[in-house]
Amino acid sequence: MKFSSLAVSLATALALSACGTLAPKNTAVAPAIPSQWPAEAAQGEVADAAAVGWRDFFTDERLQQVIGQALDNNRDLRVAVLNVEKARGQYRVQRADRVPAVAVTGQMDRRGGDAPVTEQFSAGVGVAEFELDLFGRVRNLSEAALQQYFAVAANRRNAQLSLVAETATAWLTYGADAQQLKIAEATVKTYEDSLRLAEARHERGGSSGLELTQTRTLVETARTDAARLRGQLAQDRNALALLAGGQLDPALLPDSISPQVLALAPPPAGLPSDVLLQRPDIMAAEHQLLAANANIGAARAAFFPSISLTGSIGSGSGELSGLFDSGTRVWSFLPKITLPIFQGGKLRANLAVANADRDIALAQYEKSIQSGFRETADALALNVSLDEQAASQQRLVEAAEQANRLSQARYDAGLDSFVTLLDARRTAYNAQQSQLQTQLAQQANRITLYKVLGGGWHERG
């Protein structure tokens, strides 16, 4: 057999291998989610969050550096990246089964004993055990590996989205706690000054023991808040170090929370299904479903005959010097067919497992879409509520601070008691602390909205 004949045979085998597949058609998914966003979700002609780079969304340069450090050093993200490399390698291994494995061989056979010593030399090129994929078993296994690779890659993008959002939220939390600590420490100093005055008046008989006790209560309350916030700030720093993969430069840490840190989170423009399908976790679930579908095709193909081809062409000679002389050519062609007859129900069990895996993947895909809709709807609803809370909280702080100033003036004029002044100070202090907590919740929810809409994958939009 000439080499050209062997090549023609291999080409024919490859063509036949691409003829059919027993995988079922991809299942149409119609998850039970509303066709529109909740009424409180304001619509706007804005870009999708997935198209907004995280450097465009997080506008503070210090925060950008912290996020960049986290993306470079975070161990969880590193594991996700390595999983992508592993899945890519597994796909390449599986894909290699779709083409013949051609190998060059060389052999020397020397025999002796009572008879004279004989030598035989051979060299050739051949194909070993190439499966003629008439029913799509190998192709479906390759498709399943490809979809698994796509799913792992989508999970890697989802890991990056989560890391960006968690790092930004932790950074803002540190800033809010740092600002609350400054307010608490300033309040402690003010209350301590008031306590010294109250003690002096009490010694002169100018105030009651109740007034002195209430002042001490305010001092200890503020000291407790300051101690708690110092501990919380240390925990915030540790959380940031874990996310960033190492200690941060103190110059990158915020000392307050500012509304200018974030760009406004874009509300979703379009139908829920269109927006949610851009989320990497939903994309990963979809690829898992496609992989499970392909595995059904491979399990079905296992019921049919398997045809393998082995062939070689080369040269053989009793002398090494004459190995490639005329008349020394040798060839072999060995087709093999395997027909499953009895395997104790193994093939049916494998098919049942593949069908169950597909049904599980379908349920998980539907759940991921429903969960994505709920997360987005919750963030949209909370966005409106927190905007209202922030506006109301600002008015409360302004009113409390004005009441504190008026109470101080009336106390200085002898019109109000010291207890009334202490109540006004306590109200102003609590209002300031509550305002910072509301601002943090407002910005954290904007980060959540950005994340659940699929934002944070690109560095720049």
Regions found by a protein language model. Give the residues of each.
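Membrane-embedded beta-strand positions in outer-membrane beta-barrel channels/transporters
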Residues: 67, 122-124, 171, 216, ...
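Periplasmic alpha-helical coiled-coil/stalk elements that build and connect Gram-negative outer-membrane
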Residues: 138, 154-271, 382, 427-428, ...
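Short, acidic/charged, Gly/Pro-enriched secondary-structure junctions
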Residues: 78-96, 105-107, 290
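Short segments within alpha-helical structural elements
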Residues: 188, 195, 221-251, 299, ...
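Sec/SRP-type N-terminal targeting helices
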Residues: 79, 95, 132-160, 210, ...
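Terminal intrinsically disordered/low-complexity segments used for targeting and assembly
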Residues: 2-72, 146, 230-277, 283, ...
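Small/polar, glycine/serine/threonine/aspartate-rich low-complexity segments that form flexible
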Residues: 43-45, 49-58, 63, 105-130, ...
